[in-house]
């Protein structure tokens, strides 16, 4: 599978059918799990899909997100190889419901308790529509029962493990409507899920309750509430800090203001694309979301349109 197609599967593969597609068509045998110590007892794991945070200590292990099912044993091995504990992963906290962050829920559910915000369970259980921002949407079938979180929360939840009061905080209407950032206060590390990414323009899943306004608000809330020297694990990309988040917010606000200005001038979406109104931020289009796709996402977010013009049913 070509890289662009793989990334689109990683970010937009939602629930059971899309996960099966990804697992059958990508060779996960070649994926290696890279482990980086972040701070305290928190580590960052990179493989395929979203970044994983892991708190590893004498009480056991809690991980944030779990990538894809075929990687579950590799993730377990990477954690065991740290030599800190032989205890299993006790808890998995999902930052949101997309398949590249929840794809390992089924194998991890055998020994772990899955935790997520209320809307994550709802969307996994019912199946959802997702649009990339290029006018296409996908309707996914419900996830298997084993993939569903068995503990859910509305606004926040705390897990007391390894000397940490690990806090999951709901950030509504950002990347999706079920987003949560996970803060490890003693280690001074936060996992921000896909509300903050380092691959270029972000994917905002409007069809799943996300919005550019909510993403900006969530990132600003994180900066206001977190310690200034906190280490930031993004949903995708390199380990970061709050200055990186500030630059990200600056890009989101600038692109949004450009679209708002064009809307006030009664310009159509096609006119905005032809005029390349996001050209000043072109350096941010290095990922799989190009400037036209991100422009359409902002336009749809501001005007209340869905991201998809048609649905592809699996």
Where are these regions (language model features)?
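Conserved beta-strand hairpin/beta-sheet module of binuclear metal-dependent hydrolase folds
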Residues: 33-81, 180-184, 189-194
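Bacterial N-terminal signal peptides that target proteins for export
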Residues: 1-11
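Metallo-beta-lactamase
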Residues: 60-62, 68-70, 158, 165, ...
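Extracytoplasmic/secreted envelope proteins and their assembly/folding machinery
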Residues: 52, 72-76, 86, 105, ...
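Accessory terminal helices/loops
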Residues: 14, 18-23, 224-229, 238-314
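Cleaved targeting-peptide boundary
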Residues: 23-29
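Active-site HxH/HxHxD metal-binding segment of metal-dependent hydrolases
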Residues: 28, 80-158, 177, 257
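Divalent metal-coordination and catalytic microenvironments
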Residues: 41, 55, 65, 79, ...
